Amino acid sequence: MRVKVIDADAFSYIFRTLEEFIDEITLDFTSDGLKIRGIDPSRVTFIDILIPAGYFEEYNVEKEEKVGVKLEDFTDVLKTVTKNDSLYLETDENQNIKVTLDGVYERTFTFPSIVASEIETPNLNLEFPFKAKALTVTFTDIIDEIEDIGGDSITFKAEGGKLYLSANSDMGSSTIELSTENGGLLESEGGDAESVYGLEYVVNTSKMRKPSDTVEIAFGSQIPLKLRYNLPQGGYADFYIAPRAE
């Protein structure tokens, strides 16, 4: 297996985001692309990612290969990527994964494959009463603003085709309206709904602003929030965040 990433910096931010939730992952290289699944230790957030073969400049995968890595070590290397670096991933005969950064000079790092914990896929057959789409930078900037207010929860409320995000803390409260009319949303559909989620989990997805241009937001009353950060060539990073009992 050997692949070459087109935008190494953007690629690194997918893993920087994952590191906010989990400690180890299995990289599943298939004919369709690189698949990654994970669930955080508190079992609040389930993650499902597809980085399609077309996302890569080169994608040489003859058969499915799974490689487990410790995210901290793997991400520390990816954080050293510079704008002009080419990034290669490949496996050797022992299923170790080699990361090569080729820029002004070549740097190579080899990580032993680990046996990552098996992921039990939750039931994701969900019907979402409200769905919307926004620019990723718009959504994540708003989430960052709400984080500044403090508090540990965020309320998602859909009413009249508009999306309201709000939070409360000792510092005060904040409510932000997003709609197609004010440009906060690119599109929206569905009925009214309201649910509360842990603010930390939503904030931890915000690094996806780097590799993703648009985000799809779907939720309903007392069901998980789904954030789909769209990636080039039909890829996606899905985050399912369980609601809080309020």
Curated annotation (Swiss-Prot):
Protein's GO biological process: leading strand elongation; regulation of DNA replication
Top-rank taxon: Archaea
Role of this protein: Sliding clamp subunit that acts as a moving platform for DNA processing. Responsible for tethering the catalytic subunit of DNA polymerase and other proteins to DNA during high-speed replication. Both trimeric complexes inhibit DNA ligase and both 3'-5' and 5'-3' activity of Hel308 (Hjm) helicase, but stimulate Hjc, the Holliday junction cleavage enzyme.
Organism from which the protein derives: Sulfurisphaera tokodaii (strain DSM 16993 / JCM 10545 / NBRC 100140 / 7) (Sulfolobus tokodaii)
Keywords, alphabetical: DNA replication, DNA-binding
Assembly description: The subunits circularize to form a toroid; DNA passes through its center. Replication factor C (RFC) is required to load the toroid on the DNA. Forms dimeric complexes with PCNA1 and PCNA2, and trimeric complexes with PCNA123 and PCNA323; does not form homotrimers. Crystal structures show a heterotetramer of 2 PCNA2 and 2 PCNA3, which would be large enough to clamp a Holliday junction.
Name the UniProt record assigns to this protein: DNA polymerase sliding clamp 3
Lineage: Archaea, Thermoproteota, Thermoprotei, Sulfolobales, Sulfolobaceae
Pfam families reported for this sequence: PCNA_C, PCNA_N
PANTHER family in alphabetical order: PROLIFERATING CELL NUCLEAR ANTIGEN
GO molecular function: DNA binding; DNA polymerase processivity factor activity
Family: Belongs to the PCNA family.
